[in-house]
Regions:
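Sec-dependent signal peptide recognition
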Residues: 7, 23-31
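Bacterial Sec-dependent signal peptides at the C-terminal "C-region" and cleavage site
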Residues: 35-45
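Short hydrophobic targeting helices and cationic amphipathic motifs
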Residues: 4-7, 11-14
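Short, linear, compositionally biased motifs with a strong N-terminal bias
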Residues: 13, 31-32
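Secretory-pathway ectodomains
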Residues: 44-234
C-alpha cells in the first residue's frame, strides 16, 4: 500500500466518523426539540373568563392555579350576565345599558347602547364569527352584529312578560337558524324565528338562564335561580 492510499483511507474513516457524530448530534437536537415542545405543550393551561350579576369586574383566571391574569372594572349598575372572548382575543360583554367590545388593553372598540327602558343581557359569539346581542324590553330585541359592530339583522319579539328584568339572560342560536330564548317568569324556552315568530315552546321547571347545544342534538338548560341543570330536547 502506498503512503497516498494509506492517508486516503484515514481521511475516509475520519469523514465517516464525522458524519456519524453529526448524525448523532442532529438526532440529539431533534430529541431535545421534541422534549421542549412536549414540555411547552404540558405547560399550556385553560383560561376561564368570569363575570356575573352584582360583580364589579370581569376577570380571566388560570384554571389550574386560580390566579387572576387579567381584569376589567365595571361601573356601578353595570349588570354583566354575559361575557365572552372573541376569536381574535377581544372581550365582548353585555352590561345592561348596552354591549361593548374591548381589547385586552381595556380600549373600547365599539359600544351598542340599549334603550333606557331596556336591559342588554346577551352577548355571544356565533359559529359564523358574528355576534349575537339581545336586550329585554317591550319588545325584546335580538340582533346579529359583525365584529366591526355593524348591525346585520334585528328581530323583535314580545314576550308577554310585563317586567323586562324577568324576561331572559342568555339567548342562543340553534342549528336551524332560530333563536332559543329561555324565559324566567314563564319557566320555558321559546324557539323564535328571525321573523319574530314562535316556532316551539318547551316548558320546564325552574328559571332557565341559558342553553348549550349537545352533540346528540339535545341541549343543556341551566336554571339560574332554580339551581339545576337538565338535558332537554328543544
Amino acid at each position: 500500500m502506498s503512503h497516498l492510499e494509506y492517508f486516503t483511507g484515514i481521511l475516509a474513516h475520519l469523514q465517516i466518523d464525522k458524519l456519524l457524530v453529526m448524525h448523532k448530534l442532529f438526532t440529539y437536537l431533534c430529541s431535545a426539540l421534541l422534549l421542549v415542545t412536549a414540555t411547552s405543550c404540558e405547560k399550556k393551561t385553560e383560561k376561564l373568563l368570569l363575570g356575573g350579576s352584582g360583580w364589579n369586574k370581569i376577570v380571566i383566571i388560570d384554571k389550574n392555579t386560580k390566579q387572576v391574569e387579567w381584569e376589567h372594572p365595571l361601573e356601578k349598575g353595570w349588570e354583566c350576565n354575559s361575557a365572552v372572548a372573541t376569536p381574535d382575543g377581544n372581550i365582548l360583554f353585555a352590561y345592561a345599558r348596552g354591549a361593548k367590545l374591548i381589547d385586552r388593553n381595556h380600549q373600547e372598540i365599539w359600544n351598542i347602547a340599549a334603550p333606557d327602558t331596556c336591559e342588554m343581557q346577551t352577548a355571544r359569539v356565533l359559529p359564523d364569527g358574528n355576534y349575537l346581542l339581545g336586550w329585554v324590553g317591550h319588545p325584546a330585541v335580538i340582533m346579529e352584529v359583525s365584529p366591526k359592530g355593524e348591525i346585520l339583522s334585528r328581530t323583535e319579539y314580545e314576550t308577554g312578560i310585563e317586567h323586562p328584568h324577568a324576561q331572559f339572560r342568555q339567548l342562543n342560536k340553534n342549528a336551524r337558524g332560530n333563536y332559543l330564548m329561555p324565559l324566567f317568569a314563564t319557566s320555558d324556552v321559546r324557539e323564535i324565528s328571525p321573523r319574530g315568530e314562535v316556532v316551539k315552546i318547551t316548558r320546564l321547571e325552574g328559571t332557565p338562564f341559558t342553553t348549550l347545544a349537545l352533540a346528540n342534538g339535545n341541549h343543556w338548560v341551566a336554571c339560574g335561580d332554580g339551581h339545576s341543570l337538565m338535558e332537554v330536547n328543544l
